[in-house]
Amino acid sequence: MNFFQAIILGIVQALTEYLPVSSSAHIRIFGDLMLGSDPGAAFTAIIQIGTELAVILYFRHDIINILTHWFGCLFGRNGKDWKARMGRGDEYATLGWNIIVGSIPIVILGFTLQDVIETSLRNLWITVTVLLVFGVLLWVVDAKARQNKTMDDMTYRDAFLFGLGQSMALIPGVSRSGGTITVGRALGYTREAAVRLSFLMAIPAVFGSGLLETVKAVKNYKTDAMFPGWGPTLVAMVISFVLGYIVIIGFLKFVSTFSYKAFAIYRIGLAVVVALLLIVGVLPAIDPSVAAAA
């Protein structure tokens, strides 16, 4: 991978990370088209740190409030009984606990299925299938859902279900935001609430995955045939951070006015295009280096 290709992939990451269209699927597809090979799970996870840093910058006030209120309640600022320590009556502390609960599924499944995630699940036929299926689900759920729940209405049950939706994004093509937004809309949350919860809930998962893959890349970069090198990876990460911040602003404005129908149609169209490219042999279903590792 050269630096121009890294810039392109950084742009692709920034444009698709927050939208319910699956950034990992786009990185996988564009990587194959430009490089002739899969950039790999490590590259994908590391450059996602860039887009998640943009999330932290944009939501910095919410994050500071969540952390200060959560720690304050935990250490007895609002009372010594367990309900007070769990954030009773404190919306930010409660949101902090909900984010923790919502992170449980992806942590368990991420560690349990790590080898499968990095090999078998990167098959583009799987990507095509989930692009199509979750595109239809997003379309139907968004059109039929109630729109009366806000972030203050979240329960631990809802948080866990949000987390299950997020954990589906371990499969390239599902989309982290697509999974959580679809679950959120099905549970009756407004579009704005579903998106904000999706952003905040992704922070622990993305940073955890990114830091884990960074450590692995540092240890194995000389022997990992798929890792494109630190120079291009860091360039892509910086590009994804800068452009990602702009995309967040635009996306939040978009969902306050429009439905997710356009994204659902895009997912279905992309699934058809990728399927055709697979059929005619332009794209391989599984990168040879991934197949060898499986």
UniProtKB/Swiss-Prot annotation:
Keywords: Antibiotic resistance, Cell membrane, Cell shape, Cell wall biogenesis/degradation, Hydrolase, Membrane, Peptidoglycan synthesis, Transmembrane, Transmembrane helix. The gene is uppP. Catalyzes the dephosphorylation of undecaprenyl diphosphate (UPP). Confers resistance to bacitracin. One of its GO terms (biological process) is cell wall organization. It catalyses: di-trans,octa-cis-undecaprenyl diphosphate + H2O = di-trans,octa-cis-undecaprenyl phosphate + phosphate + H(+). PANTHER family: UNDECAPRENYL-DIPHOSPHATASE. Belongs to the UppP family. Bacitracin is thought to be involved in the inhibition of peptidoglycan synthesis by sequestering undecaprenyl diphosphate, thereby reducing the pool of lipid carrier available. It is a multi-pass membrane protein. This is Undecaprenyl-diphosphatase. Its EC number is 3.6.1.27.
